[in-house]
A protein has these predicted regions:
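Secondary-structure transition motifs
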Residues: 1-90, 107-109, 135-148, 152-160, ...
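N-terminal beta-strand/beta-hairpin edge segment
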Residues: 1-7, 97-100, 112-114, 127-128
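Membrane-embedded beta-strand positions in outer-membrane beta-barrel channels/transporters
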Residues: 7, 53, 113, 141, ...
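Transmembrane beta-barrel domains of outer membrane proteins
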Residues: 41, 117, 194-196, 220
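Transmembrane beta-strand segments that form the barrel wall of outer-membrane beta-barrel proteins
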Residues: 95-99, 122-130, 201-209
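Solvent-exposed loop/turn segments connecting transmembrane beta-strands
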Residues: 102-108, 131-138, 210-218
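Membrane-embedded beta-strand positions of outer-membrane beta-barrel proteins
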Residues: 163-165, 193, 219, 234-236
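Outer-membrane beta-barrel translocator/channel fold
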Residues: 171, 242-244
């Protein structure tokens, strides 16, 4: 599949209004009143996208220049190279070799790449990399066990996670379109970590943070009850630390 130089524009008059392509959706909708099990089974050896543009606007909602707005999305210069080896109701196996785009809020994704394999029991991500103008985040591996999950609370508390963040550089200014307070944080933080546990109870068994030559932290950290702010607490152990 190759998509070069395309523009895809979605629009609503109000949040409750139908999309401007609703007539297309209706045309392909099944007329059968008896619901049938969807049997999706797709494979794309190669999906190439270049110079793509995508927009989504809800006309009744205010625009917020310089700040990301989910009601006014404007993506330019979308490029991607993807291999979808399997996609069906039970599993997914995909390789995003490279994806990049610019968003009108000022957010720029220079590169996204990853391998993902998932089924009903687990999901495994390998060689995840995100590059922003001054950020390079690398996750060597990430795995979540979904075998005991039957609800959202179970996902938060009963889905074991294993995560490895290889040495990375984070610049909070790159995220300022989402969090305007980060606009003045132009310095880079070096980060690496090894973590496991659950979404709601996270154990950073190895954490290294370095800020230029002004700050260094090496240690461990536990975050408990993350989704319950009134009950959240942090327990840490410092192996080495200095601030100048």
């Amino acid at each position: 599949v190759r998509l070069f130089g395309f523009s895809f524009n979605l629009r609503k008059h109000t949040p409750e209004s139908p999309l401007n392509l609703q007539f297309v959706i209706d045309a392909f909708a099944s007329k059968d009143s008896i619901k049938k099990e969807k049997n999706i089974d797709l494979r794309f050896n190669s999906i190439m996208i270049r110079r793509g543009n995508f927009s989504y606007n809800v006309d009744s909602e205010k625009e917020t220049p310089g700040k990301f707005n989910a009601k006014h999305i404007d993506i330019k210069n979308l490029s991607a190279k993807i291999s979808l080896k399997a996609f069906n109701k039970d599993s997914v196996n995909a390789h995003i070799k490279k994806m990049s785009f610019d968003e009108a809020s000022g957010f720029s994704l220079n590169k996204l790449s990853l391998n993902v394999v998932g089924n009903r029991d687990s999901a495994f991500v390998q060689d995840f990399e995100v590059r922003l103008p001054q950020t390079n985040l690398k996750i060597g591996r990430a795995r979540i066990d979904l075998s005991e999950i039957d609800s959202l609370p179970a996902l938060l508390n009963n889905a074991p996670i294993d995560l490895n963040i290889t040495p990375s550089q984070i610049c909070l200014k790159d995220l300022s379109p989402f969090v305007p307070a980060f606009k003045n944080f132009a310095d880079t933080i070096e980060l690496s970590a090894e973590a496991n546990g659950y979404i709601n109870n996270f154990n950073l068994k190895r954490l290294t943070l370095k800020y230029s030559d002004k700050m260094l932290f090496i240690g461990q950290m536990e975050l408990k009850n993350i989704t319950y702010p009134e009950e959240t607490y942090l327990l840490g152990k410092v192996n080495k630390m200095y601030i100048t």
